[in-house]
Amino acid sequence: YVKELEAYCAELEKNHDEDHGEKLLFFTLDSYDNKTCIYNTTDIMLDHMMISAPATQILAGLGDGDQAGRMTDTVDAMDEMMELFYQHKGLTDKFAEGTDTSVIQKNRIPSRHLNIRYMKMFSGAFMYAGGNHIGIEWDSVKDLILTQKPSIDENGRLTGGAYFGWGIAHEIGHQINQGEYAITEVTNNYFAVLAQADGTNDSVRFSYDDVYEKVTSGATGYPSNVFTQLGMYWQLHLAYDPGFAQKTYATYQEAFDNLLFARVDTYARNPETFNSAGPEVELTLTGNQDQNLMRLVSAAAKKDLTTFFTRWGYVPDEETKSFMSQFEEETRALYYIDDNSRTAVLENKASDLAGQEVLAGVDVQTEHSDVTLKMT
């Protein structure tokens, strides 16, 4: 492919002049413009994504040296990232032998490819999602070529390299968002965090200090910052998924069993998947994303998450309260979890102070509504 690409790009201007250039005597009036000439195009078809971009920009992104290696790493990483995203939706093309046909039909990755496509942008934009494609500007095309393939360890933790940046994953998220609970510019970013989180607080786009302020404020409604709101969805992943962010699984059933949002989205697509088990209160969905989310997550976790969602400013209606109350109450303070603490647990580095005499003394000072604790 790289050899053909190099040869093709070398002939672009000549081919344009021969086929598209308007001639007057010895002059070509319609001169070649590499940003607009329709010949300057290459299509790269992958398992779940098609990249349609200027050939010269793909070649420029490959740089010098091991161009074929960089191309291979790039297409492999795109396939891996899409598989990761789809597994968190409970979608895959990998099913255990003997899986019921109806399960396969309802939970298979869509056959239609997503398309990352070079587009002329409207004012101020460099990337967007629309229809069944992601539009990117000229300068963003080169960034599709990875300089270092992501390295993922056996626990699903990103240890080196990177995927394709926040913007691409953000726009893909717009395309694959689950409509029953989607919040624009929030839930689509769950996929962007999946692509970059490495088990540390610094690797996510939001601030855990802002999360703490929200969940201790007692205020109803969403936080004003969409990235802070994203923290709620991420805390649910941290609380209920046993692996790190990039962990994928061999079959649909394994992904369903291990990924909270795989169950959430499966139940959203087909509530009967939950209801067929004969729950005390069946899952029904409404036109309200907040009520849907609370019901879906509680169903997926098999926990009454009233306290968690209330801390985040959600107000369950009577039907949602009834649905969540059939489950055992979640007693863990999930609204305080962060990446660092969860990584410490996964790596068996967390400290348990239960039963230990660790405080020699506590000094309490109060001034109006401020309380200062000094522990020794």
Across the structure, where does each feature detected by a protein language model lie?
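Acidic helix/loop microenvironments that form the catalytic cleft of cell-wall polysaccharide enzymes
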Residues: 192, 258-278, 313
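Active-site rim elements
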Residues: 217-224, 279-285, 294-296
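Long, domain-scale functional regions
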Residues: 71-75, 79, 257, 279-280, ...
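Catalytic cores of extracellular degradative/oxidative enzymes
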Residues: 22-253, 257-261, 265
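Beta-strand-enriched, solvent-exposed domains that form extended recognition/catalytic surfaces
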Residues: 1-10, 14, 374-376
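Short, flexible/disordered intra-domain loops and linkers
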Residues: 62-67, 247-250, 276-287, 320, ...
